[in-house]
Amino acid sequence: VNEERGKLPAWSSVLAVVAHPDDESFGLGAVISAFIDAGARVDVLCFTKGEASTLRGVEGDLGTIRRGELTAAARELGITTVHLLDYPDGGLTDEDLSELAEHAIGAARDAACDGMLVFDTTGITGHADHVRATKAAVVAAPLVGLDVLAWTLPDEVADELHAKLHGDFRGRPSKDIDFVIEVNRQRQQTAVHCHPSQAVPGSALWQRLDLLGDREYLRWLVRQENAAT
């Protein structure tokens, strides 16, 4: 086993690029926490306010509620800056990719980032907005000379979630996974609870966290020849 496979890249500044408020916690939370524990600064670029979610754990205007939830979760995770944009939830695929990428370029330059962290190109849950947010980061990366690291699921976890919940979960075979890291989920769990409109009992989130245990799985999407690793 490659010893480096269990260590995150030694980045001092990371930009997480996501589609919705809660993606930074439900999806990337434990990895963000691990980067921060290693001394990195982490910023988040979130393209939508998540106003189209069908999960409504609280009453009220969902876009406004979820903006507040994201702010609270970011504080718990230790995120430095959140860039929250107002693209339509569920409509990122219709937005100009180069325009989305420009936002990622700007945020990465603002924080002098060493790399970007995203959802896998599968979108993990098959959500088209997840796929589009990742594409924006992948387009931006070579223009700022950055690597892109993707959070993914191993096939066995995705298959079990699919069997139990009939959702569109998409994993990767072990040969396509570059990192298996041990994580402490304490900050992630606290951040998840900052999203009461979405962290509803019995949702796929809880079953996924149970199946993953204290591990997360990552793969390279973009490697620059001269980028820091």
Annotated model-derived regions:
Residues 1-112, 138-143:
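Active-site rim/loop-helix segments in enzyme catalytic domains that contact anionic ligands
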Residues 1-15, 94-229:
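Metal-dependent de-N-acetylase/amidase catalytic core
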